[in-house]
Amino acid sequence: MSKEQTLSQPSSRVSFKELQQIIKMGLVQGNLIPAFAGAWLAVVMSNHSFLSSIPQILLMLIGSTLIMGGACALNNYYDQDIDRIMPSKQNRPTVNDRISDKNLLILSFGMMLLGEACLFLLNVPSGVLGLIGIVGYVSYYSIWSKRHTTWNTVVGSFPGAVPPLIGWVAIDGNISLIAIALFLVVFCWQPIHFYALAIKRSDEYSLANIPMLPSVKGFKRTRISMFIWLVFLLPLPFLLSSLGTTFVVLATLLNLGWLYVGLTSFKKATDQTKWATKMFIYSLNYLVVFFVLVVVISLIKMI
């Protein structure tokens, strides 16, 4: 067997770092924050004991990690053709043949089945929401909208916003206005976050023939869309007024700060990529700060 043939065969083992790439662990971890916040708020608002709820919360987090990781692995399987074209994806194990398609599918479906088992052990609503998230991300986003419409980011935002709902129903069993408010925050946050990333990688998406908004409609249209979604975020803290005035004020300032950064940095930026980078960095911090506020302020109210 030649050296070239040996190198082209998928490795029988992948490293832990490569496994993290396959299941998109960074994305998974980011979604666990709102999932935990949803469960935490359900504990607080329904007067459950936090200590007695720890097993439910842990099972919810494990189940959520598994279904999200499995869905992301399946996304990587389906996207291999376009990932091979995009320069930023060349280190993915699915692109450089570090894992076979067979093992990738076993990993993906195994994780999703185990994750769904965990969520259904909690209650039926948690399991159903998990299924909605999987089907929405894999079918409606990855297979359909990502390759066919500039609305792909918005379509993908729906399953991407399911984690706080899963967190809430894992404890409460029913969806409430508070849970819907958390869902809407994550839903409106995602287009801004991913449009900023799409601006940074506009040339790559064009090369791969993926109809991301910046690649098809241009920077101006994308920037307008980002500001529209920012405006949609502005009233959402008021849906969480049960957390108190302090939370509403701080969350509103967080929203206004993002709007301010978007408006002022655009005037100063010498190119659109620098502006998109600032918006992207703020988006990463925004989600963490918002849900930390949710947890901390509700904890203070308990005390």
Curated annotation (Swiss-Prot):
It is found in: Cell membrane. GO terms for biological process: heme O biosynthetic process. It is a multi-pass membrane protein. It comes from the Bacteria. Keywords: Cell membrane, Heme biosynthesis, Membrane, Transferase, Transmembrane, Transmembrane helix. Pathway: Porphyrin-containing compound metabolism; heme O biosynthesis; heme O from protoheme: step 1/1. Its EC number is 2.5.1.141. Carbon 2 of the heme B porphyrin ring is defined according to the Fischer nomenclature. HAMAP family: CyoE_CtaB. Converts heme B (protoheme IX) to heme O by substitution of the vinyl group on carbon 2 of heme B porphyrin ring with a hydroxyethyl farnesyl side group. This is Protoheme IX farnesyltransferase.
